[in-house]
């Protein structure tokens, strides 16, 4: 008796640095999909792939982890996660640059990646991680021509996770019981939605009323969330966060591969939502087998709208700079 053999799922990691290698490892642990680690740096993807592959024996999972320096190896990938690009401006100290300064360097890289994805896996769900995030998602989308619902960016899942962790630590409870969302751009003008935070379904404001947290402490947590990436950079002295960013991207990939219909905040294309058009920015969205299946619109107060507008203005200016590059 013969039957149809289902094809194994495949994820391509474009960029095999700390985030890329960690994402490969997470795929091994979760037995999520076969992995291709791609990088233009010879030796890096080969070494990371070998290390991740050997971990399958210990994890008792059956995942193929291979390496590539040529785009044809990513052919047929169901998901592509892009971390390729510079993480700091050459010749400048950590105090002399911001994520936005990476634009001219990383736009060129993203456009090259877009051509490879367009040629070899045009049906893939693409998650961009490269900074400046929202602008780089737009850059990839325009260069690749992939459908809007199949292109998004990872930042807000990470920002929201940090927000949840800080609140959980203050309340001395598990972060799994904290529901909190950060929208807007991945930078100083991100908007942690403190008003919408719940604890196992109960409004955080009820805990504040009972003295479990003060309004001042909540405001402090909001500001810490905005600076959380920089806090890690300063503590490390070299490099930046990679465990939480990697898990954030894999969570999004899993939602697509398993059609989980997860509500996850991420950089998505706006078609009138929040009064925005033709731009990518961080908003809560439903991720399932159809990619970005729905963008969720929340009611914002006047103050929240003003904060969100600052995020929008940041992205608009970056998009103008992107267009000026030609």
From Swiss-Prot:
<dbReference type="GO" id="GO:0006089">
    <property type="term" value="P:lactate metabolic process"/>
</dbReference>
<feature type="active site" description="Proton acceptor">
    <location>
        <position position="186"/>
    </location>
</feature>
<dbReference type="Pfam" id="PF00056">
    <property type="entry name" value="Ldh_1_N"/>
</dbReference>
<dbReference type="InterPro" id="IPR001557">
    <property type="entry name" value="L-lactate/malate_DH"/>
</dbReference>
<keyword id="KW-0520">NAD</keyword>
<comment type="pathway">
    <text>Fermentation; pyruvate fermentation to lactate; (S)-lactate from pyruvate: step 1/1.</text>
</comment>
<dbReference type="InterPro" id="IPR022383">
    <property type="entry name" value="Lactate/malate_DH_C"/>
</dbReference>
<dbReference type="InterPro" id="IPR011275">
    <property type="entry name" value="Malate_DH_type3"/>
</dbReference>
<feature type="binding site">
    <location>
        <position position="131"/>
    </location>
    <ligand>
        <name>substrate</name>
    </ligand>
</feature>
<dbReference type="GO" id="GO:0004459">
    <property type="term" value="F:L-lactate dehydrogenase activity"/>
</dbReference>
<feature type="binding site">
    <location>
        <position position="99"/>
    </location>
    <ligand>
        <name>substrate</name>
    </ligand>
</feature>
<dbReference type="Pfam" id="PF02866">
    <property type="entry name" value="Ldh_1_C"/>
</dbReference>
<feature type="binding site">
    <location>
        <begin position="39"/>
        <end position="60"/>
    </location>
    <ligand>
        <name>NAD(+)</name>
    </ligand>
</feature>
<feature type="binding site">
    <location>
        <position position="162"/>
    </location>
    <ligand>
        <name>substrate</name>
    </ligand>
</feature>
<comment type="subunit">
    <text>Homotetramer.</text>
</comment>
<feature type="binding site">
    <location>
        <position position="131"/>
    </location>
    <ligand>
        <name>NAD(+)</name>
    </ligand>
</feature>
<keyword id="KW-0560">Oxidoreductase</keyword>
<dbReference type="InterPro" id="IPR001236">
    <property type="entry name" value="Lactate/malate_DH_N"/>
</dbReference>
<dbReference type="InterPro" id="IPR036291">
    <property type="entry name" value="NAD(P)-bd_dom_sf"/>
</dbReference>
<protein>
    <recommendedName>
        <fullName>L-lactate dehydrogenase</fullName>
        <ecNumber>1.1.1.27</ecNumber>
    </recommendedName>
</protein>
<dbReference type="InterPro" id="IPR015955">
    <property type="entry name" value="Lactate_DH/Glyco_Ohase_4_C"/>
</dbReference>
<comment type="similarity">
    <text>Belongs to the LDH/MDH superfamily. LDH family.</text>
</comment>
